[in-house]
A protein has these predicted regions:
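Conserved catalytic-core motifs of GNAT/GCN5-like acyltransferases
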Residues: 123-124, 136, 141-157
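Short glycine/proline-centered loop/turn elements that form peptide/ligand docking sites
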Residues: 101, 105, 127-131, 148-154
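Acetyl-CoA-dependent GNAT
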Residues: 9-94, 102-107, 111, 115, ...
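A short, internal acetyl-CoA/4′-phosphopantetheine-binding micro-motif in the GNAT/acyltransferase core
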Residues: 89-97, 124-127
C-alpha cells in the first residue's frame, strides 16, 4: 500500500497513544473531540470546559489515532491516592465493536496500575450495553443510579478494581 494512499484500511493504522495536554490542542481538534463525545454519549461540552478537565497526564490522556485524526479518546483523572475516575471514553461509532475499547482500557489500566492506582470509577449511560459489558468484564459493578445524568437518559455509577485484562465473567 502506498503511504500516501488514503483508500487503505484505517484500522491497520490505529493505535492508542498518549495525548498532549488539552491546553495544547488546536480549536479544530477540540471541536472534533467534543463532537465525538456528543455522538457517543449525547453530552455537549464547551471546548473551554474540555480544556479545564483535571486529566492526569501520566495515565489519563489517550487518543485512538492514525497519526492524523483522532477516532477515540480516553480521559481520566486521579480521584485519590488509589482511585482513578474515567471522565470520557468515546470511540467513533463506526469503529465500535472492533476491540478498540478493550485496547484503550488496557492501555489506560496498565499506565494507572504502574502508578499505584488500584480502583476505578466512571459513569455510563444505562442503555450503553456494550460499554457496561466491557466494564463488567473488568470487575466494575453498578454502585449508584444517576437519574437524568445524560440529557434524557439515566446512568450508572460503576466502581471496581482496576484490571488490565478482562475476566472470563
Amino acid at each position: 500500500m502506498n503511504e500516501n494512499d488514503d483508500s487503505g484500511d484505517v484500522l491497520d493504522h490505529l493505535e492508542w497513544v498518549k495525548s498532549p495536554s488539552l491546553s495544547h490542542w488546536t480549536n479544530h481538534r477540540l471541536i472534533e473531540a467534543r463532537q465525538l463525545i456528543y455522538e457517543t454519549t449525547g453530552e455537549l461540552y464547551d471546548t473551554k470546559r474540555l480544556q479545564m478537565l483535571p486529566l492526569d497526564e501520566r495515565f489519563g490522556m489517550w487518543v485512538l489515532s492514525d497519526g492524523r485524526k483522532d477516532y477515540g479518546i480516553f480521559w481520566a483523572m486521579k480521584l485519590n491516592k488509589q482511585t482513578a475516575r474515567v471522565l470520557a471514553f468515546s470511540i467513533s461509532t463506526d469503529l465500535q465493536g472492533k476491540g478498540f475499547g478493550a485496547q484503550g482500557w488496557s492501555t489506560f489500566a496498565l499506565a494507572a496500575k504502574n502508578l499505584g492506582i488500584k480502583r476505578v470509577q466512571l459513569e455510563v449511560r444505562q442503555d450503553n450495553t456494550p460499554a457496561i459489558r466491557l466494564y463488567h468484564r473488568r470487575g466494575l459493578r453498578p454502585r449508584g443510579y444517576i437519574t437524568g445524568f445524560y440529557r434524557g437518559h439515566d446512568g450508572w455509577l460503576m466502581m471496581g478494581p482496576l484490571r488490565v485484562q478482562a475476566s472470563s465473567q
